[in-house]
């Protein structure tokens, strides 16, 4: 057991080090984005919503086709991938990194690796379910996809995408400030109250 844990830890450390090396040119930008997403200042949440709203308003006004939209998005990613490693050191000054910044960059890369591992783990579980319980897999997939299709039919595509993107960008800050755990705790307490009331009525 201990040997397996050590092997997993070593593999995680190796993957994290590899990712750090790949993203070294994005280090300054990632640290700045991390501060924004974790709401280190009070005006960061409205700034996030304002920028996202502006981008989606531009998309709504231009109304590009799917092919044009995908092409522009990929072109933007290619430009960012080329320009950011060149311009970031000149703007932020990578030589001025502190130990705290280096540690935070390591934590960000480690969290990204863990998130990727979770996604791969869920994907493998899905295929395991398909092999071991094909009927349950089939019903789960049909019901889930039907629900997603119904939501997509009821809500405009652009509005739905806007809500998803905004929620994902606000999620780290909500988690950092304990807002998610707070409301989950409130929901659990309310559910427990309802269950206790139901038990009393049955008695």
Swiss-Prot record:
It is found in: Endomembrane system; Endoplasmic reticulum membrane; Endoplasmic reticulum. InterPro entries: ER_autophagy_membrane_reg (IPR052114). One of its GO terms (biological process) is endoplasmic reticulum tubular network membrane organization. One of its GO terms (cellular component) is endoplasmic reticulum. Residues 1-41, 87-133 are cytoplasmic. Keywords: Apoptosis, Endoplasmic reticulum, Membrane, Transmembrane, Transmembrane helix. Pfam families: RHD_RETREG1-3. It is a multi-pass membrane protein. CDD domains: Arl6IP1. Belongs to the ARL6ip family. Homooligomer. Heterodimer with ARL6IP5. Interacts with ATL1, TMEM33 and ARL6. The transmembrane domains are required for its ability to shape the endoplasmic reticulum membrane into tubules. Positively regulates SLC1A1/EAAC1-mediated glutamate transport by increasing its affinity for glutamate in a PKC activity-dependent manner. Promotes the catalytic efficiency of SLC1A1/EAAC1 probably by reducing its interaction with ARL6IP5, a negative regulator of SLC1A1/EAAC1-mediated glutamate transport. Plays a role in the formation and stabilization of endoplasmic reticulum tubules. Negatively regulates apoptosis, possibly by modulating the activity of caspase-9 (CASP9). Inhibits cleavage of CASP9-dependent substrates and downstream markers of apoptosis but not CASP9 itself. This is ADP-ribosylation factor-like protein 6-interacting protein 1. It comes from Pongo abelii.
